[in-house]
Design a protein with these regions (language model features):
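Thiamine diphosphate
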Residues: 1-142
């Protein structure tokens, strides 16, 4: 077994899932040509193209809303929010739309997405870059 850093393992997992299922796509700020803030998506834009590795504007609620719509439409999006501290603007959509879609529609719709968000940061940055409020999310899913 190869020794991989966490970022290398994430990159490899994304490649494997994208090769296995053409419904899987990535979206987030700077994840395309730049390879993401931690370089977890490095090389994926070149490998899978702009339709499956989508650079978005800096708009977390837009990233989440788009991912939810894609998921409900049959795709398997993997949205990335650069830092957990920036997830606040998307919190309503994540908890009130995605998490409750199956119950709200009596099983007619689901929201199969994987949200990627670095937590804790590890970079000792100021506000919004080193938050670790995971407990908020573990207590909001329905």
């Amino acid at each position: 077994m190869a020794n991989l850093t966490l970022v290398q393992a994430i990159n490899l997992a994304l490649i494997q899932e994208m090769e296995k299922d053409n419904r899987v796509l990535l979206l987030g700020e700077d994840i395309g040509l730049n390879g993401g803030v931690f370089r977890a998506t490095e090389g994926l834009f070149q490998r899978f193209g702009e339709n499956r590795v989508v650079d978005t504007p800096l708009a977390e609620s837009g990233i989440m809303g788009t991912a939810i719509g894609l998921a409900m439409g049959g795709l398997r999006p993997i949205p990335e929010i650069q830092f957990e501290g920036f997830l606040g603007p998307a919190f309503d959509q994540l908890t009130n739309q995605c998490a409750r879609s199956n119950t709200r529609t009596r099983g007619a719709l689901t929201c199969p997405l994987v949200l990627r968000v670095p937590v804790g940061g590890g970079i000792h940055a100021p506000e919004h870059h080193s938050d670790s409020p995971e407990a908020i999310y573990t207590h909001t899913w329905t």
